[in-house]
Amino acid sequence: MGGIQSYLRDFVALLPPEDVVVFASTQDPMAAREFDKSVPYKVVRYSSKLMLPTPQVKKLMVDLIKSEGVSTVWFGAAAPLAVMAPAARAAGAIQIISTTHGHEVGWSMVPGARSVLRFIGQHSDVVTYISDYTLRRFQRAFGEHPKFVHLPSGVDVERFYPVDEKQKFELRDQLGWAEKDKVIVCTSRLVPRKGQDTLIKAFPEIVQRCSKARLVIVGEGRIEGKLRRLAARDQKASSRISFEGRVSEEKMGMMLRGADVFAMPCRTRGGGLDVEGLGIVFLEAQACGIPVIAGDSGGAPETVTPASGVVVNGRDSSGVAHVIVDLVQQPAALMSMGHAGRQHVVDHWTWEIMGARLKSLIL
């Protein structure tokens, strides 16, 4: 399940099931059947793997709005699905909500796509956004008509939680990490924007200054081979780097709780087309009570406070090394930043907060 699908699944789970009808594509028929049986709300499937605003999809949507008496239509991916907003309103919808995820920044930079965003804005009552950065980049493209509402993913603070020192050492034993290791974890897709290469380039300097440092890279992606080759260039450093691949949500939580620092020095690429919309992983790490090192791309800096994390230039490996070494060698700072991060998430980023925000928009 991709990021947008997960986002929508988690938000829909917060709504009264008797008031919800989901119209969705079918990526995997068997998985779709199992999912649909497991949820308490009604799911209507479009047979194709991809849902685009075609005449067939529009007709099915209109029929569903009429048959179910739908008053609010929520387009889970504004671009391009919300071009069907006029048809939804003509079918009886009173409120149109269109949700953005970050890729609309790229659309706003291309004249033809920008005009599509303007059309969506003219016919939507609410456009939601995941970060102030993305709003700044595309607000003018959507125009003045819609109300803009901040609606990022929430964090499950019962699944992502901190542990005490004894529990941390027990987790490390299960994960094969030494008690005295200084563990830096990065969990993300292995793609150029995320900055795992910067961490690997920084690591020889980190190990030179902190011999107990350990870098744990979690995730899969198209640059894994390149990253492994980069890590192998320095024998001493490479022995302290592990590639964990894809892990379960349970194990990812264990890794975050057992780590000293979370680092993902993301950077903007492609002249602004490839940018970090927000970065929920930064918030999940803070919920687990560990300091965060975030790259200065897009909305990533909005996830941390000066008390809970450090924002770095994702292209400056030496600067990243300096920040990491400075942090892991200060146990008191690790603890205070971890506490601050947990409180930051509990106060501002829980699903309870985000769910209430969504419910306030629905008529």
Regions found by a protein language model. Give the residues of each.
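N-terminal strand-loop element at the rim of the active site
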Residues: M1, S6-P53, T134, Q139-A141, ...
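Short His-centered aromatic/hydrophobic patch
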Residues: F75-L81
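Carbohydrate-associated surface elements
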Residues: Y133, G154
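Conserved donor-binding/catalytic core segment of Leloir-type glycosyltransferases
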Residues: R172, A178-K194, I200-P204
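Nucleotide-activated donor-binding/catalytic signature segment of Leloir-type glycosyltransferases, i.e.
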Residues: G225-G253, D260-V261
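Acidic donor-binding loop of glycosyltransferase active sites
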Residues: R257-V275, I290
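Conserved acidic donor-binding segment of nucleotide-sugar-dependent glycosyltransferases
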Residues: D296, T305-S317, D326-A332
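A short, well-ordered alpha-helix in the C-terminal region of glycosyltransferases
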Residues: G319, D326, A333-D347, R357
